[in-house]
């Protein structure tokens, strides 16, 4: 193999988010004192917040008429792990594209931050069913740099698999089996085709199963209309929930804000724009505003109508990451010499991200809650999520955005 020939690398960020919403007895006030406020945790949350919003806006720029769903944590983890073996401009572009300021944060601290994040997400004692995994798939005649392997295992809990990429169907099956097992069967064909020059693949997945602290009662679910746009309406099963809910109107965003807690340590922030204000919401949304919503919890008597939904996202990360400044890794100028000891250069030939989300009121019974309330001075708000809205799901200990989505059509 001469140095003029470039070998291919596949990057796969695959995930599943499944959200059943039963088996919770009561709502507890959020204890912000229990949040992990370590420097590493704060650093990763800040950068992932910026990264999440940048990615979201790029996806909206590519298409503002379709559902959006992705995991900032999954994508960032995959690229950060790849940066362990990158050098020069390739290295700088990756970390700066992930919104890290390299003059303020050392590379060692960045990887320690991801290490801490993954340890937190994979805690076995958490009520939240949340797990992540990283797989390195190496051609059986390719020798990787030992330092890269050690750091990938230490900081990113990576598993290493030896495969024969010359047998593309066999190699594809090994990768797909890893993702399918990690996502408990929610993603069954993460890789559809392998480039013929692929010799190394990196796969990341994240699986999330959450149960609402305050569940929906399936008996209250009725068919209702969802307005995709001014001329399109679809029928959806609309769930209903009443009681003391964390909901308020944000004049800055011209949107209603609803916070829903999961059993464990996760919170979903739903943003329902006023009529004609979706573009304003998307342009104005910031991590600072989201942080305020998470810190300043306010419950009031309210009723919400929310669609049962299932959406997915599949993205070519080359077109998604390039506007964020990550370009060198995809072309022949890529410097990934810290990954392999071979003379032939390595470049990222494929980069795929897949995501699946289900929100429903799974289960045959919901918790019974008796609430005694004083008569309010004003009528409680009734929120109908019957037109496009945004949402972000956070892990509370690290305040990291696990998932970001936009629901344009809940039936697709």
From Swiss-Prot:
Annotated region RCL: the residues are: 368-387
Q: InterPro entries of this UniProt entry?
A: Serpin_CS, Serpin_dom, Serpin_fam, Serpin_sf, Serpin_sf_1, Serpin_sf_2
Identify the glycosylated residues.
64, 101, 265
Q: Name one GO biological process term.
A: response to cytokine
Task: Note the SUPFAM superfamilies from the entry.
Answer: Serpins
**Entry coiled-coil feature ranges:** none
The keyword Ribonucleoprotein appears for this protein: no
Task: Reproduce the free-text note on domains from the UniProt record.
Answer: The reactive center loop (RCL) extends out from the body of the protein and directs binding to the target protease. The protease cleaves the serpin at the reactive site within the RCL, establishing a covalent linkage between the carboxyl group of the serpin reactive site and the serine hydroxyl of the protease. The resulting inactive serpin-protease complex is highly stable. Variability within the reactive center loop (RCL) sequences of Serpina1-related genes may determine target protease specificity.
Q: What is this protein called?
A: Alpha-1-antitrypsin 1-3
The gene that this protein is the product of is Serpina1c
């Amino acid at each position: 193999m001469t140095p003029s020939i470039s070998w291919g690398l596949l990057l796969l960020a695959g995930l599943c988010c499944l959200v059943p919403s039963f088996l919770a007895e009561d709502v507890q006030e959020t204890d912000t004192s229990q949040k992990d406020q370590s420097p590493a945790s704060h650093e990763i949350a800040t950068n992932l917040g910026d990264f999440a919003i940048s990615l979201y806006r790029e996806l909206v720029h590519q298409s503002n008429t379709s559902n959006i769903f992705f995991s900032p944590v999954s994508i960032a983890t995959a690229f950060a792990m790849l940066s362990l073996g990158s050098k020069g401009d390739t290295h700088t572009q990756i970390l700066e594209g992930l919104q890290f300021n390299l003059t303020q944060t050392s590379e060692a601290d960045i990887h320690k931050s991801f290490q801490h994040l993954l340890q937190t997400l994979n805690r076995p004692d958490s009520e939240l069913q949340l797990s992540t995994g990283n797989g390195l798939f190496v051609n059986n005649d390719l020798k990787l740099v030992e330092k890269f392997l050690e750091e990938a295992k230490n900081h990113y809990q990576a598993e290493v698999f030896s495969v024969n990429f010359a047998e593309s169907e066999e190699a594809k099956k090994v990768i797909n089996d890893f993702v399918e097992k990690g996502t408990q069967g929610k993603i069954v064909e993460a890789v559809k085709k392998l480039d013929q020059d692929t010799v190394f693949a990196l796969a990341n997945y994240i699986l999330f199963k959450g149960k609402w602290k305050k569940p929906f009662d399936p008996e209250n679910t009725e068919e209702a209309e969802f307005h995709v746009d001014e001329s399109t309406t679809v029928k959806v099963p609309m769930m209903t929930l009443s009681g003391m809910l964390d909901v308020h109107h944000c004049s800055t965003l011209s949107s209603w804000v609803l916070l829903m807690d999961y059993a464990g340590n996760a919170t979903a922030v739903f943003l329902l724009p006023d009529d004609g204000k979706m573009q304003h919401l998307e342009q104005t949304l910031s991590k600072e505003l989201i942080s305020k919503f998470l810190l300043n919890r306010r419950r009031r008597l309210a009723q919400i109508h929310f669609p049962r939904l299932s959406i997915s996202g599949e993205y070519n990360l080359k077109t998604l990451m390039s506007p964020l400044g990550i370009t060198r890794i995809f072309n022949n100028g890529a410097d990934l010499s810290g990954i392999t000891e071979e003379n032939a250069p390595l470049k990222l030939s494929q980069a795929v991200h897949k995501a699946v989300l289900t929100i429903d009121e799974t289960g045959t019974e919901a918790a019974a809650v008796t609430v005694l309330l004083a008569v309010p001075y004003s009528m409680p708000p009734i929120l109908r999520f019957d037109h496009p809205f945004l949402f972000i799901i956070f892990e509370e200990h690290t305040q990291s955005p696990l998932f970001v989505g936009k629901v344009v059509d809940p039936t697709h």
